[in-house]
Amino acid sequence: LVPREASAERVEDIRWLNGALGPARDWDVFLDEGMPPLFSHFPRKRGLALFRAKAETIRAAHRQALQQTVGDPRYAVLLQAFTDWLDRRTWRDGLSEERRAKLAEPVLDFATPLLEHTHRRVVKRGESFAELSSEERHGLRIRIKELRYALDFCASLYPAAAAKSYLSALSSLQDCLGVMNDIVVTQRLLDEAGLRTASAARQVIEGWYGCRLAVHEQLFAELWRGFGQCSRPWQD
C-alpha cells in the first residue's frame, strides 16, 4: 500500500544507521554465539588465543563507531522523522485516490492474497534450496521473515491453532537460515581480521564452521518437510 517513493527517505536513513549497526552486530554474534564452543574445545591453541584478542579489538572499534553514529545529530533527526512519518501518517500524502481507497477496504481482502502470494514465493525458492548460493539463501530468509511478520500481524483474522503452527514452522526455518548466514559472514570477518588462509587458526575455524553449516543444511531439509505439512491458516 505504501509506494516505494514514499518510504525512500526513511529507507536511506535506516541504511545509514545499519552501516554502523551491522558490523557491530556481526562481531557480537561471532564472538558471543559462534566462537565460545570453539574456544572452549581448544583452550591451549595459541593461534586461536591471539586471534581472539585481535577480534575483541576489532569489535571494540565497531562498537565505538556505533556509539558515534548514535551520538550523531542525524540519528536524533532520524528517530523524530520516522516517528512523525508514522504518527502523522505523512506517508499517505503522495497516495493516489486508488491507493487511498484500498486503505478503507476490509483488511481480510488485502491480507489473504498477500499471504498467499508471499507463501508461493517462499515455496518456489525453498524447493531448490540445495542449488541456492549463499546470497540466494539469504534472500530466502528475508522472504520467510516477510511472510512470518505479515501473518503475525494478521494472525487474529485466521484460526488460532493453524496460525500458531504455521508461524512456528516459519520461525524455525528463519532461525536455521540465520545461523547459516552467520556462518557465511564468518569468512568476511576472518578476512577483516587479516587471518591468513594458510594459518592454523583459520583452518580450525573454517573446519568448525564447515561442520556447523553441514549440520544446519540437514536441519533445514527436515524443517522444510515439516513446513510443507503445515496448513495455510488463510485457507482453513
Report residues per predicted region.
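Function-determining surface determinants
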Residues: L1-D236
